[in-house]
Regions:
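Sec-dependent signal peptide recognition
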Residues: 1-9
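C-terminal motif of bacterial Sec signal peptides marking the signal peptidase cleavage site
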Residues: 14-15
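Accessory carbohydrate-recognition regions in carbohydrate-active enzymes
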Residues: 20-202
Length: 202
């Protein structure tokens, strides 16, 4: 009887102890695997089965950049809300947003000549990629971009330097690779606090 009582007491004490700390499995994830070579992997913020994959889109429009990102490149033409990953064919890049400082241009620009368009080099040494979050400094503008996502929404936060010439450009025309806009438009709400828009493409 004493042995049964001791075992019962030990079981009760064991049940009263703190549960083991939850393991953070996302710390083992490297979202940049497959972004070099011919991997065509998207880098940015998304959630499983989400409708948006918000992340950077680079200026090159060739096969290895069909996800919008390649490890060998540090250009950013904007942050698009839809990307394909690992497909080997380019599409989407819908609703691209680019924070800028200074004179606004709507030209895409030429590779190796940032002054020809609105794009910037990204500081890849300070880039942060983890599940559900992406951040990178834009060298040309001194802006830090941060992105995260829900199932249906891409969320952006931009930290600008002190300036009277800060702006955010919404690019409805430029897609990626073989994607071409066929119908685009936007409108402001009556109180100018919201923007609604659309982009249809091939």
């Amino acid at each position: 009887m004493k042995l049964t009582g001791l075992l019962f007491a030990a079981a009760l004490l064991g049940a009263c102890t703190q549960p083991a700390a939850e393991e953070n499995y996302t710390r083992h994830v490297d979202p940049k695997i497959g972004t070099g070579g011919h991997g065509h992997v998207f880098v940015g913020a998304n959630v499983p089965f989400g409708l948006v994959q918000v992340g950077p889109t680079s200026i090159p429009q060739t096969w290895d950049w069909c996800s919008g990102y390649h490890a060998s490149d540090s250009t950013v033409i904007g942050f698009s809300h839809t990307h394909l990953s690992g497909t080997g064919i380019g599409d989407l890049f819908d609703i691209t947003v680019m924070p800028v400082v200074g004179e606004v241009t709507y030209a895409r620009g030429e590779e190796n000549d940032p002054a020809s368009g609105l794009w910037s080099y990204a500081d890849r040494t300070r880039e942060i990629t983890k599940p559900g979050y992406y951040s990178v400094p834009l060298v040309r503008y001194g802006i830090t971009a941060e992105l995260t996502a829900t199932e249906r929404v891409g969320l952006h936060r931009y930290t600008f330097p002190a300036s009277d010439a800060a702006a955010v450009v919404f690019d409805l025309e430029n897609g990626g690779c073989w994607d071409k806009a066929t119908d685009t438009g936007f409108r402001f709400s009556d109180d100018s606090t919201r923007i609604a828009g659309w982009r249809c493409s091939t």
